[in-house]
Amino acid sequence: MRALVVSIWVFINLVFFGMCGYMYLLWSQYWMYIEKDTETTTNTYDQQIYYYNRGYPMNETLFRIQNNTESKSRIKHAAKDAANITIIRNSKPRFPNVQGSDFPIDTDRYVCMKNDTAKACDNKTQQYKERLLKELKRVFLDESNVLKPGQENYYNVVYKGPKENYMEKTPKQILCELKNVELTTLKRSDIKHDLYGLRSYIPKRDLFENNKFNSCAIISSAGSSTKSSNGKLIDSYNLVLRFNNAPTKGFENDVGKRTTLRILNSQVMSKDEFKFLNSKMFRNITILAWDPTNYTASLEDWLAHPEFNLFPNYIEYRKNFPRAKIYIVNPRTIWKVWDYLQRNAPNRLRRNPPSSGFVGLVFLLSHCDFVDFFEYVPSVRITKRCHYYEPEDNASCTFGVWHPLSAEKLLTYYVNVASDSDVFQTGFVRVPGFNKLQC
């Protein structure tokens, strides 16, 4: 009798576990089908954002996606062939949950109106601040998920240092650590093997060596600059930094008209559509160009195989304008900035270089009494528009696409000394320069 009961009990358990296993197989097959069904759309979206965030106009972006999706071998050989572009494949959108998020975008709900009382304005500002910081933290945690697709390590990043929580340190400690980060431009003495005849055109000194400025402004290209009316304020700074091909003409009321320095990614310098050699936008200013390299590559490796070959146009520009001030970031030191970000983040960062914005901030902090960064931490005018000068929408540009943007912005706000009204209503964070620090 006991044997019969045991047999029935074993049989029932086998049936139960068998049914569970069968249901699991059905469920997993269903999700595999969904993954395959959405893979094409996802990859197109991801590549669109990759190209767009690296400097291509949207119409050129879509053209390049269509012409590259069948060319898988380009990824494998991208590091060896400067004409090839590393395409982000088999990965999720960089901000996959933005549409499902309850974070308000393109609304004037939190904008302080003329008839608002001071208390009402403060309440709006605090409500927006809480929601924005919560959203940035959510994106940061989402991006650090090691099981999440899209965690490719294209630059072979091997980080072995600590991962600390920046909030357990004081803002002064964070800035003192940043002060010790070596971020430099290429100098003539750095180049030992001159492959392109480049050496004689490289400056002998570092960018802004021995130069100091009182007030510095960095103008992001964010769509939230629209209707800010910050133009006159921006033009009042001693130094004004802009990015890539962001225009001022027609947008002076919001972003000003003065430009002292432009940071250009290597695509803007190397691709014909940006007219680097002919556009007046790139004349009579200081230019700082950058191009990423492998995390462990030597300078000689990068000079031989840049991601995008900016050197021919760099040399031609120097020939055309011998007195021009044009510099190139030492690509090895860009990863020192990434190491700094990872060291102050308890979770793993996306293993791509930091953004041009954060690189620009680090550069200027060594030369400015303070740096005001406009619309880096997005104000109440936050919008899905990527850029103030183009109509295309994509909220991913604000919260993180290819660079570890959410981590950068959280850290920058943590060391900010501007009031919440300045940050979230006017639209700038203020970071004190290194010369004001007592480390």
What residue ranges belong to the model's regions?
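Metal-ion/cofactor- or nucleotide/acyl-coenzyme-handling active-site neighborhoods
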Residues: 2-439
